[in-house]
Swiss-Prot record:
GO terms for molecular function: lyase activity; nickel cation binding. Keywords: Lyase, Nickel. Involved in the biosynthesis of a nickel-pincer cofactor ((SCS)Ni(II) pincer complex). Binds Ni(2+), and functions in nickel delivery to pyridinium-3,5-bisthiocarboxylic acid mononucleotide (P2TMN), to form the mature cofactor. Is thus probably required for the activation of nickel-pincer cofactor-dependent enzymes. This is Pyridinium-3,5-bisthiocarboxylic acid mononucleotide nickel insertion protein. Pfam families: Ni_insertion (PF01969). Its EC number is 4.99.1.12. It comes from Staphylococcus saprophyticus subsp. saprophyticus (strain ATCC 15305 / DSM 20229 / NCIMB 8711 / NCTC 7292 / S-41). The gene is larC. Belongs to the LarC family. InterPro entries: Ni_insertion (IPR002822). GO terms for biological process: protein maturation. The keyword Magnesium does not apply. It catalyses: Ni(II)-pyridinium-3,5-bisthiocarboxylate mononucleotide = pyridinium-3,5-bisthiocarboxylate mononucleotide + Ni(2+).
Length: 391
């Protein structure tokens, strides 16, 4: 059984909103506070209180400092975490989040990561938000994290470098390859801290799948809008082997080019199909053709039938339900000689039976190292076996 967290970021995500939602979910404030007090931080106090945001009761957070605090370099933060007595998983998760922000800032300013002088995350409240959220995850026993697409907001924002369009440069860099949601609001909805949390720890971006929801918490931001400025944190459980039913949609096509079919596959996957592929077949009178197959959830079958009829030359679609059984999958980021690599794990009976590095991470590592994909993949796979016990 996996204890998971789904973040509904319909109004964006910021560090204080996230930590507040986890406390509302049931994380022990004393556990979080005492661990934070063990770190060499400026004197501070955490004040959580319920607030009403357009009819939604949500937890809010105010952090008070006894005196003005200063920005810190990335290397200072990494050293502080490494030398701390924080739980190992809290250290790992916190480091991953800070690393995401450091890499974004380093690229934007043309610097080495260790020389990055954080503005957003070097501020003490952001350090507390990040490490505090990871402590809250640990207290709740969260094993995996998923998220909805995130909106960035519109307009302009004042940052350390002046007035800049939303999303801020660091936020935009972090959110590359992350699905975004449209929300036409003239304000910043997602901060670099919130974006980094999603980028570093979320293993899936999309709608919440069929799981058993066990608890829900709400965390609010400081801004007031005409909509509830809250993030919804949903705690769920998922079994390791999940039997379910899916819908298979098929049609046979003999008048579309491979390029057009390839484009269709990309589009239908982007629309949310579980899988899509085409197979060469031979039709009557020995005509070469293609069988197009789209797999969707049962509830979305009608939607994808219409999509196939609209975007292909087919005049009809066959549809039937099938049972499938899938192993529970979760993701873990490991540090290798090529940097942080996301690894997909397949679980059975509380044991890891398969582990595979994600293609995009291996590809990027190969491009940056100048080595062949095969060599880099084999090196990373060997390091995966050292970090992860596979039965």
């Amino acid at each position: 059984m996996t204890n998971g967290l789904y973040l509904d970021c319909h109004a964006g995500i910021a560090g204080d909103m996230l930590l507040s939602s986890l406390v509302d979910l049931g994380a022990d404030v004393d556990y979080v506070h005492q661990h934070l007090l063990s770190l060499p931080l400026d004197q501070f106090s955490l004040n959580f209180a319920k607030k009403n945001k357009q009819g939604i009761q949500a937890m809010g957070l105010t952090i008070d400092f006894e005196e003005a605090h200063h920005h810190r370099k990335a290397s200072d933060i990494f050293n502080m975490i490494n030398e701390s007595t924080l739980p190992n998983r809290v250290k790992e998760r916190s480091m991953l989040i800070f690393d995401v922000i450091a890499q974004a800032e380093a690229k934007i300013h043309g610097m080495k990561i260790e020389d990055v002088h954080f503005h957003e995350v070097g501020a003490m409240d952001s350090i507390i938000d990040i490490i505090g959220s990871c402590l809250a995850l640990e207290d709740l026993g969260i094993d995996e994290i998923k998220s909805s697409p995130v909106p960035t907001g519109n307009g302009k924002i004042k940052i350390a470098h002046g007035i800049y369009p939303i999303p801020a440069p660091a936020t935009a860099e972090i959110l590359k390859d992350i699905p975004l949601a449209t929300f036409d609001v003239q304000s910043e909805l997602t901060t670099p801290t919130g974006a980094a949390f999603i980028k570093a720890l979320a293993t899936h971006i999309g709608p919440l799948s069929a799981v058993s929801m066990s608890n829900i918490g709400y965390g609010c931001g400081t801004k007031d809008f005409e909509f509830p400025n809250v993030i919804r944190a949903i705690q769920y459980t998922a079994t390791e082997t999940t039997p379910n039913q899916v819908q298979v949609l098929e049609c046979q096509i003999d008048d579309m080019t491979p390029e057009t079919l390839g484009y269709f596959i990309e589009q239908v996957i982007n629309e949310g199909a579980l899988d899509a592929f085409y197979t060469p077949i031979t039709m009557k009178k020995s005509r070469p053709a293609t069988q197009l197959t789209v797999i969707s959830s049962v509830t979305q079958a009608k939607e994808f039938e219409d999509f196939i009829l609209k975007h292909t030359t087919s005049l009809g679609v066959r549809s039937y339900a099938v049972n499938r059984k899938i192993l529970h999958r979760q993701f873990q980021t490991i540090h290798t000689t090529y940097g942080a690599i996301l690894v997909k794990l397949a679980m059975k009976d509380n044991k890891i039976i398969k582990a595979k590095p994600e293609f995009e991470d291996v590809k990027n590592a190969a491009l940056h190292s100048g080595q062949s994909f095969t060599n880099v993949y084999n090196d990373i796979q060997n390091e995966v076996r050292k970090h992860i016990q596979i039965d």
